[in-house]
Amino acid sequence: LGGRTTLDALVVTLSHSRMFAVIWALSRSLLWWLEAHNRAFERLGGIPWTVRPDNVRTAVAWGAGPWARLQEGYASYARQLGFIVDPCRVRTASDKGKVERRGRDVRAFLGALKDVCFLRLEDLQAATDERVRARVQRLICPVTGRSILASWEAEQAALLALPATLPEPFDVQVNRTVTDDCLVSFEGRQYEVPFTSMRRTVQVRGCAGTVEIYGVDGQHLARYPRGTACRLLLDQRHAEGEGDDRVRRPTPLGRVGQAIVLERSWEVARRPIDDYLELVRRLA
């Protein structure tokens, strides 16, 4: 981590079984907030139907409780995974009593780790997971009278199932209208999407190392590397497939085009012009 580093921890507690997860993060940015949610849901073995966050800026844009306006990025993430966000009310201890009690407990039983030097965040997380696992075997769930671990194992069937792939955490999200050239603009670059999305509105997310593009129905349309030197990112696969009653399939490339055009424009390899001339002669 490069010396002593101040970290934040996300503590997620299931209301029924009191099972919990502690996820360490380097910041409170939206990117890390969503990544921490992903890791917490994985450890809990599912997704709660309702999530009640405190009124932190990464979750709530303004207001609190039922009158809160959620951050659009967090709201979009919740819709994609299917859970409802129900922020805490101001000065209402009953709304977050369980997790605050768990937070005090976490500080106590993880106190021994503060004097240990961890070179990687992953090592600290592994040590934390180990202590959490031991803790839930000893603590008793007040609802069931059994251990938190045993109560959680019974509760898992009531949680929403984890998707095959959790959403890639993102720090920027915008809506864009696809041009007639099947391109969308984002961060000074243009990205190609499947031709059937022409003139439709899509959702573009800037993730840690990629740009993810989704349709309005949540369908994943395209993935590109983020922040490339290339300003026009084309993927020839997006011109394949059948058209529909709204859009016809683009005219396929000819022999020369198929031989010269790169499948992914950002993976351009520099070649002498003589190589292209020789290629054209062979195909002529």
Which ranges hold each PLM region?
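RNase H-like two-metal-ion nuclease catalytic core shared by retroviral integrases
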Residues: 53-54, 64-65, 83-108, 120-124
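Two-metal-ion acidic nuclease core segments, chiefly of the RNase H-like superfamily
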Residues: 67-85
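Acidic/histidine-rich, metal-coordinating catalytic segments
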Residues: 46-66
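Protein C-terminal end segments and domain termini
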Residues: 207-284
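Active-site beta-loop-alpha junctions of metal-dependent nucleic acid enzymes
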Residues: 7, 22-50, 227-233
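Short, conserved catalytic/metal-binding motifs centered on acidic residues
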Residues: 1, 18, 51-54, 78, ...
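Short conserved beta-strand segments at catalytic cores or DNA/RNA-binding microdomains
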Residues: 4-18, 25-26, 52, 77, ...
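Active-site-proximal acidic segments at structured loop/helix or strand boundaries
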Residues: 103-205
